[in-house]
Amino acid sequence: MIAGPAALFADGQAESDNCVLPSHHAGVSFPLDQVEKAWACRLQPIISHYTTATKIGSERTPLPQDIFLYLLDHPVMAAALVNRLDFGLYKAEQRGPQDFWATDGEGTEGTIHPLYQEGSTRMYFAQGSHDGRLLPRVTGKAVVLLQLHPVTDGRGIESIDSTLVAYLRLDNRLLSGLLSLLRPLIESVVHRQLLKAFDAARLLGGAMREHPEKVLFEATDPPALPDEEVAFLKAALMSLHNPTLSPGPTP
């Protein structure tokens, strides 16, 4: 968990007049200059006046980059597999051509808009709510920055190391007076929720490598996943057990 002044996360202060966003966050570079100006002006107050700022990683997922990216860019499919394999209570639904809604099934839900999806970098805007046992219901907006790095271990197993930086700004004015007291608790909740998502991804990757038949069964058990996703999954599972094969390009 990262704490302290905003300077620790951003090299230079974003200029509110033209909504220029810094490119360095917690020691990692992100191409925020590629974000459309209208979006940049929505992100600027979240990054400059965050409630919490969190860095996680690197976290390893035992999947090659092409398979990992496909699942990352198909969150409805990924959430369904995690749920059916009992790795979590995640659910996701497409909301329009780009946005999707997601819940962890334990009080956190929201809509997510992809801002940038190129190469090994993903950047998102999220807005949602958390209703848990330790906190009153809170709503807020977040900027989520994700950097991926493919690695191969000594056994030749391809994996992805992920580093995530997230800025959260709460909407609830009633909490502003208590923020100094609640901040450690809020930071703990955010950190736990993000780690839980990485754990689910790691478990899914492990199942795809070690129990491909079970993964495919869950994907095709009625109601089956869409045909194109099942086709990719079949090819991906085959490639994991025969590295000379490739699951094909990521649509």
Residue ranges and their predicted role:
Residues A10-G96:
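Hydrophobic ligand-binding cavity/cleft-lining segments
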Residues T51-T52, T121, R155-S159:
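Coil-to-beta-strand transition motifs
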Residues A78-W101, D221-L237:
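Short solvent-exposed beta->alpha transition segments
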Residues K91-V143:
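Glycine-rich portal/gate segments that line the openings of hydrophobic small-molecule binding cavities
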Residues I56-P64, Y70-D73, L134-P136, L182-V189, ...:
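Extracytoplasmic/periplasmic, Sec-exported soluble proteins
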Residues L72, N83-D86, G96, D104-E106, ...:
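A mature extracytoplasmic/lumenal domain signature
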Residues M1-A6:
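Bacterial N-terminal signal peptides
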Residues G12-V35, Q147-P251:
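Terminal "cap-and-tail" regions of soluble proteins that handle hydrophobic small molecules
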